[in-house]
A protein has these predicted regions:
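Fungal secretory targeting signals
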Residues: 1-41
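Short N-terminal edge-element motif at the start of the domain
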Residues: 43-47, 53-102
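Generic recognition of long tandem-repeat/solenoid scaffolds
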Residues: 58-61, 65-73, 146, 150-152, ...
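Short, surface-exposed beta-strand/loop "edge" segments at domain boundaries and coil↔beta transitions
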Residues: 76-79, 102-106, 117-120, 179-184, ...
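Extracellular-facing segments of soluble proteins and assemblies that are Gly/Ser/Thr-biased and enriched
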Residues: 81-144
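Short, surface-exposed loop and linker segments with low hydrophobicity and enrichment for Pro/Ser/Thr
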Residues: 81-104, 161-168, 186-207
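An exposed acidic His-Trp-rich patch
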Residues: 116-180
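Long, compositionally biased interface segments
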Residues: 180-229
Length: 229
């Protein structure tokens, strides 16, 4: 496990402007399972997703207009991902606001996938404990008008993806000062990743998600209410 600069103290380690949500936001999909699926696109759903695995109490619902709510209390082996977003993903200004009160491992993050190459990526906005499942490699940091982020990569071997069970790379941008609400200009992160040698492929979907998961004896709990535009 690498030593993180601003993460060294950790263990192991939304915004309804206007009257209507954009047409690219949808509340039609609420896909829920109790075991890992074989195809992550089915698991994640698309524009709105709610996926769970293992034990624990994970309750998330789409409220319409780009808003979703979650409450969770995990146990060993449990986890969930829920969020609202866009398909395809890509360069855009994602505005969000709301509340996020979390304990244990998990994130409030913009989460997405690309193909060719197959990349799973996170832009992490807030968290309690970051407890990566795989070792992270630091790739640098960057600062712009929205804040300072540290960059990491990791690799997952023979895990579920939007292309079935595959080995793929994960990209991470992690804020040095946590926030809940603001604008995420995704293109700025894509550019910073590219300069660090982190090359994305063709964009599939992306969501502003709440995620919680158990890691050893560390268990997640909390609540969130997030609106995305």
């Amino acid at each position: 496990m690498v030593t993180f600069s601003f993460l060294s103290a950790l263990v192991l380690a939304a915004l309804p402007y206007g009257l209507a949500a954009p047409s690219s936001l949808t509340s039609l999909i609420n896909h829920e399972t109790v075991a890992p699926p074989t195809h992550l696109e089915s698991r994640q759903g698309g524009y709105y997703s709610f996926w769970t695995e293992g034990g624990g109490s994970f309750k998330c619902s789409q409220q319409g207009g780009g808003k979703y709510t979650c409450s969770w209390s995990g146990q060993k082996g449990g986890g969930f991902v829920a969020g609202t977003g866009f398909k395809p993903g890509g360069s855009r200004a994602v505005k969000y606001s709301g509340t996020y009160d979390a304990k244990g491992p998990g994130y409030l993050a913009l989460y997405g996938w690309t193909r060719n190459p197959l990349i799973e990526y996170y832009i992490i906005e807030s968290y309690d404990i970051i407890a990566p499942g795989e070792p992270w490699t630091k790739k640098g940091n960057f600062t712009f008008e929205e804040g300072t982020y540290e960059l990491y990569t990791s690799q997952r071997v023979n895990k579920p993806s939007i292309e079935g069970t595959r080995t793929f790379t994960q990209f991470w941008s992690v804020r040095t000062e946590k926030r809940v609400g603001g604008t995420i200009t995704t293109g700025k992160h894509y550019d910073a990743w590219s300069k660090a040698g982190m090359k994305l492929g063709n964009h599939d979907y992306m969501i502003l998600c709440t995620e919680g998961f158990a890691n050893g004896t560390l268990l997640p709990s909390g609540s969130s209410t997030i609106t995305v535009s």
